[in-house]
């Protein structure tokens, strides 16, 4: 049995306010817990996959228990809001849904999207699997590249940079595994 008064320091900030979403990412265990929830996975499994462990499994589980105990007093975090949307929100029918930066959606966020698209006539999904930056929170570009059937359009010219940056980016890109093959051109300038 946890002594919640003693464990409270785990989820309170230095000025004694209840932790907010930003705080969960400052605490290693709560960040891993949030990643597990975003991946729709067992937190212990995600903990075991982590190569660097700042807390023991016992401390990890205690922090989760304490965090959830304090949230019972009508506190929710961002991940809770997404989970509630899946179960509690009836999304209205839409003519068009446009989703951008889709490479950074987590499995939990995709669950909401799957529910929304049931009532959508046309979906536009935009993103670049080479630009995924939220893997730390459970995002995986493979969901973006494989979920929606239909026509896929790859833009063949970037307007962001010229030849030198294009060449350098292609060297880096070759090191990205499971990336959709793209051949694109660049602006007529050096930078």
Describe the residue ranges of each PLM region.
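Accessory N-terminal region flanking or inserted into the helicase ATPase core
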Residues: 12-98, 107-112, 135
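Conserved helicase motor core of SF1/SF2 NTP-dependent helicases
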Residues: 96, 103-191
């Amino acid at each position: 049995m946890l002594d919640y008064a003693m464990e409270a320091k785990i989820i309170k900030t230095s000025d004694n306010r209840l932790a907010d979403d930003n705080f969960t990412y400052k605490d290693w265990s709560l960040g891993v817990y949030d990643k597990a929830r975003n991946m729709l996975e067992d937190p212990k499994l995600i903990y075991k996959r982590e190569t660097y462990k700042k807390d023991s499994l016992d401390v990890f589980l205690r922090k989760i228990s304490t965090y959830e105990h304090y949230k019972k007093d009508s506190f929710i975090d961002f991940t809770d809001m997404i989970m509630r949307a899946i179960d509690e929100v009836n999304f209205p029918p839409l003519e068009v849904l446009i989703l951008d930066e889709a490479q950074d959606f987590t499995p939990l966020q995709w669950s909401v999207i799957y529910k929304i698209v049931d009532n959508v006539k046309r979906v536009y999904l935009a993103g670049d699997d080479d630009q995924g930056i939220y893997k730390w929170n459970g995002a995986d570009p493979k969901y973006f590249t494989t979920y929606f059937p239909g026509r896929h359009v790859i833009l063949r010219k970037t307007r962001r940079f010229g030849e030198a940056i294009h060449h350098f980016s292609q060297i880096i890109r070759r090191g990205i595994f499971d990336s959709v093959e793209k051949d694109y051109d660049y602006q007529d300038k050096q930078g």
